[in-house]
Curated annotation (Swiss-Prot):
InterPro entries: Mur-like_cat_sf, Mur_ligase_C, Mur_ligase_C_dom_sf, Mur_ligase_cen, Mur_ligase_N, MurCDEF_pg_biosynth, UDP-N-AcMur_Ala_ligase_MurC. Its EC number is 6.3.2.8. ATP binds at residues 123-129. GO terms for molecular function: ATP binding; UDP-N-acetylmuramate-L-alanine ligase activity. Belongs to the MurCDEF family. The keyword Nucleotide-binding applies. The gene is murC. Cell wall formation. It comes from Prochlorococcus marinus subsp. pastoris (strain CCMP1986 / NIES-2087 / MED4). This is UDP-N-acetylmuramate--L-alanine ligase. SUPFAM superfamilies: MurCD N-terminal domain, MurD-like peptide ligases, catalytic domain, MurD-like peptide ligases, peptide-binding domain.
Length: 473
């Protein structure tokens, strides 16, 4: 692992059920470390950790730390936190009072990365998808790859896969500025956008954070199609889905539909071959091109890559088909930034277009259900949210998921709905998933294509619906 850690170290995660925290915890267990953690919400990840031997508490009180200290008396206790953990957290306060070691999750992930040839995916959008595509290709092409990501990778059915391998694919979080803590052999920057207004004041601060990450990478792979990466970073390793001249890796689409994208693949301007991508959407094509480029940078043959692209799948909650209720098609997506909503609605339109062109029944509508995430993000991007959401045929906006933020400016979802109404009269504010469930058949009709978007707890809707309806999936 790292000289700073030994197997006499014990790790206690406050908020262990989070998708990123649980992945790091799983990695430590696989590496032989003892792990415990607490979370107020028990989920699939906490159950998996229990199965692997972790001690999981469903409360966050100082007695938990006392128990861990007594059970692992001959170990050095490391309390692991994310930026989401508040200063007043009882476990964290107890650790501080007793001068126990407190480490940010980024420090632990960085230490794990030191044992591998690391390929790290950073960027404002598409990190989890790109991490999934790269993990899948490296696994199938080399059988010598591990992964720690912020999403469930289909090939592993997990957010962490740790073995004694050469390569490690990691997803790097920029939201809190800890991106500077990582040293990577190959750093991949998908794109850069202004987001995370709770931490950054403007795009320049975001760029500064990414530049610190880039300076710590041995090699850098950047998206030529993003103006912020193109204009602010220098690297001979670039990818594009728009241009091939003087670009190291390009995949130019010529067939785009709801089932696949077919494109011409180039390296350094030279045509190599046609590639069939079984994942729709131009944003996904860009993410896959990044994964292909990274594989080529570590020496994977193009022949192996092409053969295994047919196995590529999106991670969970990324345009994920959930099922069908009485001829209403339902998808989930993690989109919570205006640009992500744009990409998701554009992709959904491909499905609507295909279905309506072949269906003699009443044409379906594109219904967008959106749970805004963070008051600061809504305040910063409200007009951009309105612009993109208005493009759906029908829009339902639920209460804002605060993610621990205080609503200082008294912002609510009705404000978003009122502005959307000026562009699209088919907009309604709803309280939550339970109200959607109660009114589901009044809110929808046969042949509707429903896309449920957000980064909060909105994806619990389908488990609520299944308790009342027959969900065919």
């Amino acid at each position: 692992m790292n000289k700073k850690l030994g197997h006499k170290d014990h790790f206690h995660f406050i908020g262990i059920g989070g998708i990123g925290m649980s992945a790091i915890a799983m990695a430590l267990i696989k590496k032989g470390y003892s792990v415990s953690g607490s979370d107020l919400i028990q989920n699939k990840e906490t159950k998996s950790l229990k199965t692997l031997g972790a001690i999981i508490f469903d409360s966050q009180i100082k007695k938990n730390i006392d128990f861990v200290i007594s059970k692992f008396q001959d170990h050095t206790l490391n309390c692991v936190i994310s930026s989401a953990i508040k200063d007043e957290n009882e476990e964290l306060c107890f650790c501080k009072k007793n001068n126990l070691s407190i480490k940010h999750r980024s420090e632990i992930l960085a230490m794990i990365m030191n044992s591998y040839t690391s390929l790290s995916i950073a960027g404002s959008h598409g990190k989890t998808s790109t991490s999934t595509f790269l993990s899948t290709l490296l696994e199938l092409c080399t059988h010598d790859s591990s992964s720690i990501t912020g999403g469930i990778i289909p090939i592993y059915d997990s957010n962490a896969h740790i073995e004694n391998t050469k390569y490690l694919v990691t997803e790097i979080d920029e939201s809190d500025g800890t991106i500077k803590n990582y040293n990577s052999d190959i750093g991949i920057i998908n794109n850069i956008d202004f987001d995370h207004c709770d931490h950054y004041s403007n795009i320049d601060e975001v760029l500064s954070s990414f530049k610190k990450f880039a300076s710590n990478c041995q090699k850098l792979l950047i998206n030529y199609d993003c103006k912020f990466t193109k204009n602010n970073f220098t690297s001979k390793n670039q990818w594009s889905i728009k241009e091939s001249n003087n670009i190291a890796y390009s995949l130019i689409p010529n067939i785009i539909n709801k089932d696949k994208t077919v494109g011409k693949y180039y390296e350094h301007g030279k045509f190599i071959d046609i590639i069939n991508i079984p994942v729709p959407g131009l944003h996904n094509l860009s993410n896959i091109t990044a994964a292909i480029a990274a594989c080529r940078m570590v020496g994977v043959s193009f022949k192996e890559i092409k053969k295994n692209t047919e196995s590529l799948k999106l991670p969970k909650k990324r345009f994920e088909f959930r099922g069908e209720i009485n001829q209403r098609i339902i998808y989930d997506d993690y989109a919570h930034h205006p640009n992500e909503i744009k990409a998701t609605i554009d992709l959904a339109r491909l499905f609507i277009k295909d279905k309506n062109s072949s269906d003699r029944e009443e044409k379906g509508r594109l219904i967008a259900i959106f749970q805004p995430h963070r008051f600061t993000r809504v305040k910063q991007f409200i007009h951009e949210f309105v612009k993109e959401l208005s493009k759906a045929d029908v829009i339902y906006v639920t209460n804002i998921f605060g993610a621990g933020e205080k609503n200082i400016d008294n912002i609510d979802s009705q404000l978003i709905a009122n502005l959307i109404y000026k562009n699209n009269k088919n907009v309604t504010c709803l309280k939550d998933n339970y109200e959607i469930n109660e009114k589901f058949f009044k809110l929808t009709k046969k042949n509707d294509f429903i896309i449920n978007m957000g980064a909060g707890d909105c994806h619990n809707l389908w488990s609520i619906l299944k308790n009342k309806n027959t969900l065919n999936n």
